[in-house]
A protein has these predicted regions:
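Short alpha-helical DNA-recognition segment
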Residues: 15-34
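Residues in the helix-turn-helix
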Residues: 31, 42, 61
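Short, charged recognition helix plus adjacent turn
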Residues: 34-35, 63-72
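DNA major-groove recognition helix of helix-turn-helix/homeodomain DNA-binding modules
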Residues: 46-61
Length: 72
């Protein structure tokens, strides 16, 4: 499964709303909401770039792959 760390990154930077993050990054609110709650099925490179630039992080800090032990 893919896990989003957006909530953690927002907390570290004291960003309290997706609306504020949207204004700061130029990423749409609905796209951020899908990443935040884990319902996103794809993320555009431009979205990843904007978020990594804003949070000064690597892709692996934003999202991570966690193997599902039940699928082995």
């Amino acid at each position: 499964m893919i896990k989003s760390n957006l909530a953690m990154l927002m907390a570290e930077k004291k960003i309290r709303s997706l609306n504020k993050l949207s204004k700061e990054t130029g990423v749409s609110g609905p796209a951020l909401a899908r990443i935040y709650d884990g319902t996103n099925v794809r993320i555009d490179y431009s979205t990843i770039e904007a978020l990594c630039r804003f949070f000064d992080c690597k892709i692996g800090d934003l999202i991570e792959y966690i193997p599902d032990p039940e699928q082995d």
